[in-house]
Amino acid sequence: MEDVIARFENVLLIYHEPHAETLAIKDISIDFGRGNFTAIVGPSGCGKTTLLSILAGILPPSSGRVEVLGHTLYGDGSEDKRKCRSGAATGCDTGYMLQRDNLLDWRTIEDNVLLGLEIKHMLNDETRSYARELLRRYGLGDFMKLYPRQLSGGMRQKAALIRTLVFRPKLLLLDEPFSALDYQTKLLLADEVHSIIRREGCSAVLVTHDISEAISMCDRIIVLTSRPATVRCDVEIRLKEDSPLARRNDAGFKYYFNLVWEEMMKNEEFN
């Protein structure tokens, strides 16, 4: 892969406990292409969210090399390793969208979107104007003075995404952002979030348990094994449609679903 925005090279993670060690991730190597939307799927507890935490610079691996946006975050002799642990290497170029929206009930939607800018001392007339532009662009302009409790779950998650986008990130990490939503809202919001990410020109990595969601939203799916996690297979998705909703009706959708499902079924916990 020529244009790489992030890379794992032989990444290994061991959790050290008082009387035991647990091998969580074993020798994972993945290149994430710039401009691509990649999904990571696998059994519960296999290490999907752990990989996102490593990409975000939150969790150091036990060994191996990690590069994100041209910075060597982790690796022997890396000068950027210290920067990463202070959060400087990834900076605002990497955004993280969690399962929960984490909106503060006592702040308006606009003030919630501006919170990160305030914390990082980046709030000024220009960034405030850009935040309002994003709220209007993505259908929340009439709701920015309301409070989170007055919005639906889907609208709250969209506000959480905009809170991340105000930093103009180049890489978005999404940790099951639709899992708490009802099925209809989940489908509609996934379609809209996909469109927003494409329009904003971000690269993205999505962690999900939902194979259909992964196929409908992503260009590529990485299937992990049970713990200790390794890469079981790497599937490139080639469908004529780009919209997640339209992809679910694509003739090739079932082929990819069966392909990924069969790989998932090979995991030991299903045998």
Residue ranges and their predicted role:
Residues 147-151, 155:
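Conserved ABC ATPase signature
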Residues 114, 118, 125-143, 195:
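Conserved ABC ATPase "signature" region
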Residues 56:
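Helix-to-loop junction immediately C-terminal to a conserved catalytic motif
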Residues 64-75, 79-82, 86-90:
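Conserved ABC transporter NBD signature motif
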Residues 41-43:
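The feature captures the beta-strand-to-loop junction immediately N-terminal to the Walker
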Residues 107-114:
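Short coil-to-helix segment of the ABC ATPase nucleotide-binding domain corresponding to the Q-loop/switch region
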Residues 166-170:
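A short, proline-enriched helix->beta-strand linker immediately N-terminal to the Walker B motif
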